[in-house]
């Protein structure tokens, strides 16, 4: 579909995005109508999708979407969680009408219900999961575009874009690529400059993981505020008068104190030691007498 125009050729950065998101990885089962989009089969049984065919069908789908005069007449549907955020982002960027979540049966065929719509083009994320809108589209002659895996049935699908429609990153990247090509063909954005919208905004995120990340960020912010509060507290003001600092380089006069002279004693001239044996004997005699009197 790109023809000989170099502008429409797939760039190297686009190939790297496809490989990083796992868009080329199919399943272990293969539908006979999807054989034309298969490049090779791995030793573990996983089929590899030809990204060149993916890019050509992506451009064809973008041309079909641009051909609709009113962007609101394009309905984009995803009943699976992995594609709901991407569908809403695609609708916000291109002006399409999103249906994220459960598809109400009779939306395209039952004119009585309030949710009745008459779109001119239908784009679904998974032909197997979104079989109800595809079936109703066949009743009202509605052309359809679908992101198809290797095992996806192509019944009621007019334009099949071969890709991995199971992974959250692959589905988000395919919707991002489709939105970018639609805006480029409309002339809204230039091909010479990269689109400022990142593919991460189209990726599905688990609500539990988002809640855990927000909780961790809040705890980190509280800890940071407490840490900064300890260091940014105002220092106490000292109102006491500061003592004058003397010049330590000047010499300090120390008052002179006379040294007292003490006479030295001759320890060899001490009197002889008294006889300690007499005193205890006398004391013992006195105590004996006292005991005799008491008895």
UniProtKB/Swiss-Prot annotation:
Signal peptide: none annotated. The record marks 115-116, 133-134 as: Cleavage. The modification Phosphoserine is found at residue 43. CDD domains: RPS2 (cd01425). Residues 266-295 are annotated as: Disordered. Keywords: Acetylation, Cell membrane, Cytoplasm, Isopeptide bond, Membrane, Nucleus, Phosphoprotein, Receptor, Repeat, Ribonucleoprotein, Ribosomal protein, Ubl conjugation. Required for the assembly and/or stability of the 40S ribosomal subunit. Required for the processing of the 20S rRNA-precursor to mature 18S rRNA in a late step of the maturation of 40S ribosomal subunits. Also functions as a cell surface receptor for laminin. Plays a role in cell adhesion to the basement membrane and in the consequent activation of signaling transduction pathways. May play a role in cell fate determination and tissue morphogenesis. Also acts as a receptor for several other ligands, including the pathogenic prion protein, viruses, and bacteria. This is Small ribosomal subunit protein uS2. The gene is RPSA.
């Amino acid at each position: 579909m790109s023809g000989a125009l170099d502008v429409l050729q797939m760039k190297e950065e686009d190939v790297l995005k496809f490989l990083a998101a796992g868009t080329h990885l199919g399943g272990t089962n293969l539908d006979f109508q999807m054989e034309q989009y298969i490049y090779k089969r791995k030793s573990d049984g996983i089929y590899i999708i030809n990204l060149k065919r993916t890019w050509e069908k992506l451009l064809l789908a973008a041309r079909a979407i641009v051909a609709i005069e009113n962007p609101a007449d394009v309905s984009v549907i995803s009943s699976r969680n992995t594609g709901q955020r991407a569908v809403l982002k695609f609708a916000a960027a291109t002006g399409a009408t999103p249906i994220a979540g459960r598809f109400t049966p009779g939306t395209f065929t039952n004119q009585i219900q309030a949710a009745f719509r008459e779109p001119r083009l239908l784009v679904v994320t998974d032909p197997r999961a979104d079989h109800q809108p595809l079936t109703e589209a066949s009743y009202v002659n509605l052309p359809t575009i679908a992101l198809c895996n290797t095992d996806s049935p192509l019944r009621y699908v007019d334009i099949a874009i071969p890709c991995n429609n199971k992974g959250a990153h692959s589905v988000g990247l395919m919707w991002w690529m489709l939105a970018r090509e639609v805006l480029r063909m409309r002339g809204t954005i230039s091909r010479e400059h990269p689109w400022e919208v990142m593919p991460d905004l189209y990726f599905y995120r688990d609500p539990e993981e988002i809640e855990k990340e927000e909780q961790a960020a809040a705890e980190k912010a509280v800890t940071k505020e407490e840490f900064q509060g300890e260091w940014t507290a105002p220092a106490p003001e000292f109102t006491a008068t500061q003592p004058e600092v003397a010049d330590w380089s000047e010499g300090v006069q120390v008052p002179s104190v006379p040294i007292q002279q003490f006479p030295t004693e001759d320890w060899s001239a001490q009197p002889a030691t008294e006889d300690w044996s007499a005193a205890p004997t006398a004391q013992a005699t006195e105590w004996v007498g006292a005991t005799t009197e008491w008895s």
